[in-house]
């Protein structure tokens, strides 16, 4: 009886070890394996890339593509090199009114969108202030093609939000007065 239990335990340990090994291999030794994040970025469309948040193991880019799309791509680094892990895009919203949020997008890790900020405003999601990236660095050709003069990208890490099922996005002025809100 004891030998039977020992064999069952040994088999369970071997199966667990194999599962762990396969998971470790797939997470750390698969993917594109490029030397830099820029080498991994897709080139199948006419992209305009905008640097987003960066860490030692991940780099996020926002992008405009083909004159009508807006999205984000997440690149990750493992032992093999940099790989494209996740990307999402949607149609670029039509011209935005000042200090209005028309739409929000998500790739299950961040919530992001565009705003045409006028004056000192902040964008909050569930009372958590978002980070913003001004599009002033874009070339004049890109600004005209995508009609994003004066726009900024706002984003918030979903892991920092307490209630991930619903989001209340607010645009507040410098006195924290509500200018616009969107609930999703």
Mark where each language-model region is.
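Ser/Thr-rich low-complexity repeats and stalk/linker segments
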Residues: 45, 123-184
